[in-house]
Amino acid sequence: MKIAVTGATGYIGRQLVRAAAERGHAVLALVRRPDDELARFASQHVMDGELPRHLEGADAIAHLAGLAHVRRTGRSDGAAFEDANRQFALTVADAAQRAGVARLAYVSSIGVHGNRSDAPIVESSPFAPDTPYAVSKLMGEQALTRFHAQTPSRLVIVRPPMVYGPGCPGNLPRLARLVARGLPLPFAAVTARRSFVYVGNLVDFLLRAVQPDVTGECFVVGDGSDFSLAELVTLMAGAAGVRSRMFPVPPALLRTGARAVCLRREMDSLTRPMLVDWSHARTALGWSPPFKPDEAMATTLAALWPERQRGILAKVGPE
């Protein structure tokens, strides 16, 4: 099978390109500029006005390109996110349709359902996006759904929670570096669990989602990587070889303090529950994640401190 990948130079995209090539697929990486590392695993085309021509011969496309953070350009955050996560998604879908690509997998975000939930999130859970990024991802889903309703091609929407793995960007490595300094942290009482997904498992699911037997539908994806902030800090301290020095502060008080310094959303994402129910992915596609959560997190944290690869002694998280 020939698989095209947008966002191929991003964190997930690189892993997807490599995994697809290693499984014997022909891979077309759509990039803004040529990349020497990707050249080992894929043919490359620079995205331009000839996108339909570049996609000729592809059986499926995984659309990962988008905008997660705004660099100030004088435009509103909402407009920048909409251009990247809605309008560009439609451009790719139109090019794929013109090129005869049969299947498109759109990587959205669990954030379309909000940033907290007392019940596990499923595909039919209410929409409640609360950031410009999440709003734009939902707009992308809705626009692509309308577009594909008029075409014979199939659309698969994938909603992952926060993605982690060796070398991952974002809050996880920042928190790990803070823990490694051995400073006292006020997170011992933060026991609400949130779902994550290991990048290797997400990539495995995406390769399943673009197979010919998959009908167009939506999937919440996870792998059992459910951790509280207190559990993460304990794991990180073990991986860094330092003593965990947490003390309890009520989560509500942490959120109040965060609001005072304009970090309300960040603290919400650390202290409130947000679990996903990915049973539909298991039952509909017969999919099982190849990497176990405790092993995946241990691998991720060990990569932060390669000189301390002593393993993580305590197994935290589901079986």
Located regions from the model:
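N-terminal Rossmann NAD(P)H-binding glycine-rich loop of SDR-like oxidoreductase domains
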Residues: 3-23
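Glycine-rich Rossmann NAD(P)(H)-binding loop
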Residues: 6, 165, 187-192, 219-227, ...
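A conserved pocket-lining segment of Rossmann-fold NAD(P)-dependent short-chain dehydrogenase/reductase
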Residues: 73, 177-197, 201, 205-209, ...
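Mid/C-terminal beta-alpha module of Rossmann-like enzyme folds, strongest
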Residues: 208-266, 294, 298-301, 308-319
